[in-house]
Amino acid sequence: MALPRRPPTLTRVYLDGPFGIGKTSILNAMPDHTPDGAPILKVYEPMKYWRCQSTDLVVAANETPERRRGGALSRFQSDMIMASIQARFADPYLLFHERLSSKCRGKIEICDTPAIILMLDRHPVAAILCFPITRYLLGEYSLEMLISSIIRLPLESPGCNLTVTILPDEKEHVNRICSRDRPGETADRNMLRTLNAVYASLVDTVKYANLTCPYEKESWEMEWLGLPWFEESLLEEFISRPRPVICSRTRMPLDRTLLAIFKRKELCSENGELLTQYSWILWGLLTKLHTINVELFDISGMSRRECASAIMHTMPERLSTLASWNDLCELEDDVISYNKGMCNEVGASR
C-alpha cells in the first residue's frame, strides 16, 4: 500500500524595517531558486499603486503635515487626510495578505526543503502600525486615528517569519535615502530616529506577545497598571533608549513594547485601567502578533548580496506552512499579477 503523499510546504519571509536602507535591493539580490531547485517568489513594494493613482501618496504624506504647520489645513483636516493616505498605503498589503492567508493550512516547526519560498517587501504591520505610530509620535497623526488604524491589522496565519532590517548608522541611512532621490521623499532625521525606535519596539512587542498570548491576559493587565503615563517627557526616552537583546524565552518588559505609548488618560479610567473598548483593541493587537516569528537583522557593513546570503543561510530555521499544490500554483500566479499591477519592478515574478 502506497504511503500518502506529503503536502508541500511554503516558507514565507517578510522583509521589513525603516524606509531607505535597501530592502528592495536585498530582495533583488535573492536568488531565483534554492540549491534544491525550489522557486523563490518575490513580492515587491506596491510603489506603482501608491504613486500612479490620482494622488501620489508618498508626496501627500509628507506635504500634508507641512500644510497644517503652515496654516493651510486645520488639525482636523490634516488628521482626516493623513488617515485616508495611511489607509491607502495599507490597502495593497491587506489585499495580498488575504489571498495568501487562504493558502496557509497549518504550521510545522522546521522544513529543510520547502516547495516554495515567498519573500515579501513589508508586512501589513508596516502601514497599519509602524508608520502611523511614528506619525503619531511626531504629532502628525491623532491618537483616535491611530486606534482606528490598529483595528484593521489582520489575523496572522501560522508560519509567518518577520525579518526587521535595521541600519543604526544614521549618517549612512540618510546618505542612502538621498542617493536614491525619490520624489517627495525626505531624509528627516527626527522621523528616521523615531521610525527606527518604533521598529525596534515592534520586535520587542512581538516577542512579548509570543510569551503572553493567549493565556496571560490577567498578567498583562497587572503589568499595564504599573506603566507610567506616556506623557511628552517620555517621548525622547522612548526614541533614544538602548534596547539590549533579551533571550526570546524571557518575557519582554511591557514598557519596551509599543503598547507603552497607549498609556494615555484619554484611553483609561482614573486608576489607569484601560477602558473596555481599548482593552479589547490592544489585547487584540497582541493576539494578532503572537504567532509571528520575528528577528532583528542589522545590515551594517554588509553588501546587498551578503544580506541575501545571510537570509538564505538561515532559511532552514524559519517556520513553514502546509499548503496544497493547487494553492502554490495559484500563489505563483498571484505574485506575478500583483507585481505587474501594483509594483514598479519590471518582470518581478521570482
From Swiss-Prot:
This protein's UniProt keywords: ATP-binding, DNA synthesis, Early protein, Kinase, Nucleotide-binding, Transferase
InterPro entries reported in the protein's UniProt record: Herpes_TK, P-loop_NTPase
Positions of ATP binding: G17, P18, F19, G20, I21, G22, K23, T24, R176
Reactions listed under catalytic activity: thymidine + ATP = dTMP + ADP + H(+)
One GO term (biological process): DNA biosynthetic process
UniProt-annotated catalytic positions: E45 (proton acceptor)
Protein's UniProt keywords contain Oxidoreductase: no
Enzyme Commission number(s) from the entry: 2.7.1.21
Pfam families: Herpes_TK
Residues at which substrate binds: Q86, R182
Superkingdom of the organism of origin: Viruses
Top EC group: transferase
Keyword rRNA-binding among record annotations: no
An example molecular function term from Gene Ontology annotations: ATP binding
Described function: Catalyzes the transfer of the gamma-phospho group of ATP to thymidine to generate dTMP in the salvage pathway of pyrimidine synthesis. The dTMP serves as a substrate for DNA polymerase during viral DNA replication. Allows the virus to be reactivated and to grow in non-proliferative cells lacking a high concentration of phosphorylated nucleic acid precursors.
Family: Belongs to the herpesviridae thymidine kinase family.
Subunit structure: Homodimer.
Protein name in UniProt: Thymidine kinase
Gene name tied to this protein: TK
